[in-house]
Amino acid sequence: MKISDIRKTFDNFSLHIESMSLEEHKIYGIIGSNGCGKTTVMKIMAGLISPDSGKIDYGGISQRDMTMVFKKPYLMHDSVMANLIYPLKIRKIKLDMQMIEHYLEICDLVDLRQQYAPSLSSGQQQKLSLVRALVFSPRLIFLDEALSNMDIESVAFFEDYILKLQKTSPTTWVIISHQLSNVERLCDYTFFMHDGKVEAEGITEEVLQSPSSDNLKRYLQYS
């Protein structure tokens, strides 16, 4: 996937991304202060909002092969089980109950499968949102602070799970997080955004340990 010269203007904010490229089978991080444009560029990548101008080359990936998980879970007003089955139903993918059971175990909701999903705790809802995004084996997954409502143990578990999936599937991940420990552990490559632009990018270890701009230095100092 490659985006070129993307622009998006709101009343009090302007986004301009000259170039961002994503390779298959890698995990990317996007970091930066609140309001710098991280979520906006992610929504543009995911096809949820349209840029005012610019080019997006998905490299053969359709929007049905992409999914996005937000900090605030967006769940159906239905059972846990119905939420897991829904992505398969709308894509007309054959239901595999063994796989569904696997994901119920992953999010530790086996005994709550018939519970009304919005009544779950915030951490449980976040887990359900994340595994719901995985059930149809998407090629591109966007996580917008999707681990932020989980306890430390759950975060570590899902970090391990994401790294395990990366080794066995061609999925590309794009992760926004204010927890630099998440980015450092998970991401192969990281973009730093400031004021609507990508100001620094590179191998994650180099970006975090050898900041190339004053804004990045300040961000790392206070994060």
What name fits each language-model region?
Residues A46:
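Helix-to-loop junction immediately C-terminal to a conserved catalytic motif
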Residues M97-L112:
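Conserved ABC ATPase "signature" region
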Residues Y116-L120:
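Conserved ABC ATPase signature
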Residues I141-E145:
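Catalytic Walker B motif of ABC-type/P-loop ATPase nucleotide-binding domains
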Residues S177-H178:
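H-loop/switch region of ABC-family ATPase nucleotide-binding domains
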Residues E205-S223:
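C-terminal boundary and immediately downstream tail of ABC-type ATPase nucleotide-binding domains
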